[in-house]
């Protein structure tokens, strides 16, 4: 038969269902989930580029294996979850795509291993444990539809990345326990892990024509910091899991945050806020989970509530009890009380 095998698989109904699944999942993905390039793309990843080792401490390995009950699939799910959260924090994007090889089947040859583009939408309000369970379902769904050829999927999607020969993902993650080595798909970074008894060892292969080693070292350091914090406290919301090292925290919070300014004596907090709202009305003032307010929106909401409080008899020498869960409404209420001339008394909602 003259046609290659992947071409005749269109007659397979299961394969058509797989194609529809992947097209539906990836049709709206327009940007690669990757790091900022140090250099213009100068060649695709070819497996013979630079390599950096990943050092997972004995304590981290023990916590990971305990969290995943020593299961290789759940171990991979945990690594994938941490990687996606790290990329979400780096890029600011809610939709993150990471590459994975097809899951290894018993007796399967490693001559041709399909690539899968694993896409997820991240919500900062989810806990790491909740996202871990979500990621588990995403991976199970993907691996149950892993036969549809990656090269055909790129052609099916017909967006600029596919037409220009760029991949659907730029970072791939593999675990030797459940994967063969993936065929070359054009990605620039591949994170690979092996489990040896009670230790987990990792390495990163990356395109040195695109990334400087320092960039990859910094990113993998953040990945490990985030992974350590997540497995230590799986109930933490993914938007608040720390990933900076202590020296980086000091630089950001102290060295880069030298924002001392002379403020006229007697100036109130809400007056400073109003001045800032006048200077940058459309700038982001408050963000909590999926809620955001610009300075203009926050000022307008606070003014409306302040007028209501004043009409209700609130003013100087008045104390207003405030019992609200953390949200943008909490900031609106704080500003409104101050604008009315009163003081607020915070009460724990629980």
Task: Give the label of every model feature segment.
Residues 1-5, 36-37, 62, 90, ...:
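Carrier-protein-dependent adenylate-forming modules in NRPS/ANL systems
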Residues 181-198:
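Low-complexity, glycine/alanine/valine/leucine- and proline-rich hydrophobic stretches
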Residues 1-50, 169, 175-176, 249-261, ...:
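Short amphipathic alpha-helices and their capping loops
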Residues 47-61:
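DNA breakage-rejoining catalytic core of tyrosine-based enzymes
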Residues 2-19, 50, 67-80, 90-186, ...:
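His-Asp-centered acyl/peptidyl-transfer active-site segments
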Residues 238-251:
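Short, highly charged C-terminal tails/helix-capping segments
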Residues 19, 83, 136, 220-224, ...:
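Short amphipathic alpha-helical/adjacent loop interface patches that line ligand
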